[in-house]
Amino acid sequence: MAAALAVRRAGSAPAFGPEALTPDWENREVSTGTTIMAVQFNGGVVLGADSRTTTGSYIANRVTDKLTPIHDHIFCCRSGSAADTQAVADAVTYQLGFHSIELNEPPLVHTAASLFKEMCYRYREDLMAGIIIAGWDPQEGGQVYSVPMGGMMVRQSFAIGGSGSSYIYGYVDATYREGMTKDECLQFTANALALAMERDGSSGGVIRLAAIQESGVERQVLLGDQIPKFTIATLPPP
């Protein structure tokens, strides 16, 4: 029973009484404490994310889709507060749709990233949202932009984010190389996400992947037995 009760910090709540017996997830917001990733290759981008959504220590959803379409060839990966990131993504999708209608042409990936940056910076005191924007457009081809909490925007060859990213910085820095093919980027992303899911308690579930090129979007889901295995505990018996 003790394991199911919230651990109360000094001064934050009574140590005894009914309030002390409240599970921590009843007082926490739903969070996509997560691992997200995007990689640029010649001709497009690959995005990936785990699927676990938590409320404190409680797993609220095991199969969340954190790869959100913003336009036909533009997606974002969401980390942080589920409510905040959904609201920001919906607002940007709405604005980008109008922008595309006014110009009578597909929007640029940089435009979508700039909209995310403006909103995340303007409401930086109220939002808990870390976003990776990736997609393809006729002017620049495949592009990856990172908008971490606070509203900064930077273009990168690859980007990782979420609570699980701290476990895989060494792996992605050592493994990434320029000129990777789409299939190599898909495997690279799947391996990185699997490693993060092994170590991060807020990441888990299935792995969702998306490859965006001029021809369109290809999506796939890696279920439990398809997720790459690395640690001894998860390797099959000899």
Curated annotation (Swiss-Prot):
GO terms for molecular function: threonine-type endopeptidase activity. Keywords: Acetylation, Cytoplasm, Hydrolase, Nucleus, Phosphoprotein, Protease, Proteasome, Threonine protease, Zymogen. Residues 2-33 form a propeptide. It catalyses: Cleavage of peptide bonds with very broad specificity. The modification N-acetylalanine is found at residue 2. SUPFAM superfamilies: N-terminal nucleophile aminohydrolases (Ntn hydrolases). InterPro entries: Ntn_hydrolases_N, Pept_T1A_subB, Proteasome_bsu_CS, Proteasome_sua/b, Proteasome_suB-type. One of its GO terms (biological process) is proteolysis involved in protein catabolic process. The keyword Secreted does not apply. Induction: Up-regulated by the antioxidant dithiolethione (D3T) in liver, lung and small intestine (at protein level). Its EC number is 3.4.25.1. Its main location: cytoplasm. The active site is at residue 34. The modification Phosphothreonine is found at residue 68. The 26S proteasome consists of a 20S proteasome core and two 19S regulatory subunits. The 20S proteasome core is a barrel-shaped complex made of 28 subunits that are arranged in four stacked rings. The two outer rings are each formed by seven alpha subunits, and the two inner rings are formed by seven beta subunits. The proteolytic activity is exerted by three beta-subunits PSMB5, PSMB6 and PSMB7. This is Proteasome subunit beta type-6. It comes from Mus musculus.
